[in-house]
Amino acid sequence: MRDFQKQGRSAVFATNGMCATSHPLAAKVAVQMLEAGGNAVDAAIAGAVLLGICEPQMTGIGGDCFVLLTPPGEDRVVALNGSGRAPAGLDANLLRDKGMTTVPLGGPEAVTIPGAVDAFCRLSADFGKLGLKASLAPAIHYADTGVPVAPRVAFDWALSTDALQGTARDAYLINGKAPTAGQIFRAPSQADVLRRIAMNGREAFYEGEVAEDMVAALNARGGVHTLADFANCASEYTAPITGGYGGLDLWEHPPNGQGATAILLLNILKHFDVAGMDPFGIERAHIEAEATKLAYDARNRFVADPDYMTKLDHMMAPETAADLAALINPKKAMPASVPGTEAVHKDTIYITVVDKDRMCVSLIYSVFHSFGSGIASDKFDVLFQNRGAGFTLDKGHPNEAGGGKRPMHTIIPGLLKKNGSNYMPFGVMGGAYQSTGHARFVTNLNDFGMDVQSAIDGPRCFADNGTLKVETTYGPDVHAGLADLGHNVMIPEGPIGGAQAIALGDDGVLIGGSDPRKDGCALGY
């Protein structure tokens, strides 16, 4: 039990259904969908699409999503990959001939086809109850009438305005400036697009007037996108991957997501007595940082479009983790591995919903960087992700940019099982941090017996491209001790990541946790 004289929040308890996400309005709408007879899929789509209006710097219909779900009464895990592909005309040789060494963050070269809309349509048709029109209605309403900008959203928005280009500045700034907390943000053009999707499904987005607007905007900036690229976009069901840690089994998406990195990281940590360490002390932070460097080095070498990746079994093998764990010196930080060419500051939303039939949905949805590419279509203001910046331009690399390929993705929804039964859908937003965030959350639960909210609240650190980012919630002695071990310690500009989770209690009670680093909450009924 937490100390109620200290700042913090309690876990949320409910019996019928629950949502945990990063904005209270989205959580409220999701619960309302459940109360109206919808299931967890209906509610998750409603909340996620609304988050594109509440947190447009993080996500939107120009982005991608990944989903894990468990059908009611079943223990099987369904994985839907809603990430889009590069346009067929993308050619890494041409980019290198232009002098590029990485895919430019704000260029059309970074814009992959948005996959989320197709995934939402497919998910609603295959697993929803109320239909897509019902799920999109709340976002349409609030896009038209507007939402007050939340404090954390305003903080992030102000840091990201330089990314916006051309007509995107008109659509996503108010009088040329980022909105402040409490100002009303409206997106009437997106409401128009969502109405069309509600009436006519995916074709209203990937074909016809909306698609023509998107292709024209990208072509005008030098993009090689075609109407056929959009029409051919299709989400895919895949076979999830899993790994055990203590009494928990972690389920993740296979590549092109980085879920295998989280499993590898936990496999490395198995070789250390994490439970015997101070949960918020120097030793645990050091070992986690070293394991992160090694696991992410493997990710940067191997993770790619599954049609091109050949090393998944190697990443998941216990022998690989044992060999990597042997490289860790408990008394000294190793040099940082060579950074991957994918950029690191990614913005994402996460939503999890559990309904009365105990269907669980774990959904993550993103435009990659804050405001993605910064490019929006001229008529409908669809803001494009820059997920193609996750490609490398290293010739022959499995994640080399190429036409029709999916880039390595950082966004990963998670799901935990206990004793073979569904236990907890969860996610940790935060770009590259997500794999480390998954591992830290799991070890908080398993090794230290933390409840859902405490496992989210605890301080975080992240070994990232030559530095060890350490939140201010760690004491100064930890900062100093890590520096003494050779880490290049820095305090990040903002908090690290943002987590949401819902546990299925043994007595049928749902227990939700939501990260105080965000504006959101867990709500149940």
Where are the regions that the model predicts?
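Glycine-rich phosphate/pyrophosphate-binding beta-alpha loops
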Residues: 251-259, 348-352, 364-376, 428-434
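Internal maturation/activation junctions in enzymes
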Residues: 272-367, 379-380, 387, 493
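Short, small/polar residue-rich loop motifs at catalytic or cofactor-binding pockets
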Residues: 237, 345-348, 409-411
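Extended C-terminal subregions enriched in glycine
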Residues: 357, 405, 438, 447-494
